[in-house]
């Protein structure tokens, strides 16, 4: 160091010393300015520089841990294939392999603190590193625990030694893999394996959850070997609904169960509800199984369905109101009415005619356009009595004619009877008395005033008796009133002409020209 630089350094050092507060150690130093003081300052400066250089060197060339040395050695030498990584239980317990936390260099640290010393000599060659690793492997292993252990994975580049083989022999092995073409599950990177970032190797200990899972896997009992079965027996989880439906169909005995499904149920276990899903089955085999089961159920004979019994036939016979337990179907219908009623000249009506006449007037149940005016379609006042109506009315007349009319000989008549105003014509036996007419017409439930008007319209003799034509016209007017027609002021001659025919003889009508 030349004089110029030395003088500059002395001046700087003198300035820093002047700025620094005086301490206890500087009390014994000689006064500045003398030769002795300059020598002391130079010696102190050189000592301080040496300490700073040694500190920088220790901070820059910090000894690397053995893991970094092993990683550097792995990069230099080709990797040796290792079949299975071996876990050592006591490897982390050695103080040599524990990774020391780097102590950050602090420029403000006091100079009197002890300096860190390197653990390993960084100039050691590869043989020294291998020897160190072998020494660590030769540590005694005393019954490593299964559930709680601190494993440290061996680097993949280190050769396999007989000690490692003995340790791996004592480790319990997992059960053998199942047969059935199961796909290998990709191994997830465990925390115990070394992770290399940027050429450096770091070790991370296993967590409690990982150790518990490992212990549970090792404590699980071995499963029995599955018998040889076709690959169709495996059922993917995507088609479980179809197979469950097929299984329910076999329970109902509607179709024989598929042999593929039965075989899969036998292989899976005694319980038919538990289906073993294997992810190793391809989609083609599963589709073949579904098609086979559907064909088997389709070709199976369906259950015989017997038709329901026919309903019992209804009895056409009508039950009597007086005798509800007896039916009139067995006894033939009598052509004559009951004995309490008087016989008429009219024969009993047939059932077919009554039904035809009943349906004749009820063709249109729903009236179309009820408020529309149909002048030409409406039924006008009837100008004549039909043959059917005349026969019905003549039957009532024949049953009631001559009632309550006294019949006496002319010789037996007294003078008082001859002089009386009450005299009947000789044909009174063919007429109906007014009392009988009132009793018959009152059954129509028409007002007495309407019945009186009808009597006045048909009573042409004014003797209290009605002939056959008068009685028939009166009955016809009652029916017209019940149908809604108004009573005429005078009965037209066409109505009288229609009822003048001989009873029982039909006179054909002459067409008008």
Curated annotation (Swiss-Prot):
Signal peptide span: none
Compositional bias (Basic and acidic residues): 1-23, 128-140, 217-228, 237-248, 374-383
UniProt feature, compositional bias: Low complexity: 67-77, 296-305, 327-340
CDD domains, A to Z: EH
SUPFAM superfamilies tied to this protein: EF-hand
Alphabetical keyword list: Lipid metabolism
Keyword Iron (UniProt): no
GO cellular component: cytoplasm
GO BP term, example: lipid metabolic process
EH domain sequence ranges: 412-502
InterPro entries: EF-hand-dom_pair (IPR011992), EH_dom (IPR000261)
Function summary: Positive regulator of phosphatidylinositol 4,5-bisphosphate turnover and negatively regulates signaling through the cell integrity pathway. Involved in rDNA silencing.
Protein name stated in the entry: Increased rDNA silencing protein 4
